Amino acid sequence: MKLLRLFFTLFICLVSTSGYAANDDKPFAEKKIVLQISDPNPFKQTLVLNVANNLVKHYGPDKVDIEIVAFGPGLRLLLEGNSNESRMNGLSKNGVRFAACENTIAGFTKKLGYKPELVSQATPVSAGVVRILELTDQGYRLVKP
């Protein structure tokens, strides 16, 4: 039984870290930031994009590694047709990544009756909170504007 538990624990560790690795395209990044958006308020969604933009401007795109993780009502930021889509495109060109919680997508799908489309910059992750924990374990600092 202990051996089975050990194998199960090792399996979970391998699976949880293999799906969506941190950005290896920024080997010279001095700062690693994960921005959380879980609020439906458009002001907060704009604010999280402003923070990302300010960080890129201050440090330069090669010196800061940023991932915006959206879950719960904050997922609306990453839905196709969002008024901030062009801003996200610009941030993405500067290396900012966007993660969309699959648990929230499933909840939206159930409520809406169809799966909502995400902006092209968004990458689905199994759970937004888990993604944040993975990144903080890798040295990222959590900022929740």
Regions found by a protein language model. Give the residues of each.
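Secreted/extracellular ectodomain signature
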Residues: 20-145
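Bacterial N-terminal signal peptides
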Residues: 7-16
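Positively charged n-region of N-terminal signal peptides that target proteins for export
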Residues: 1-5
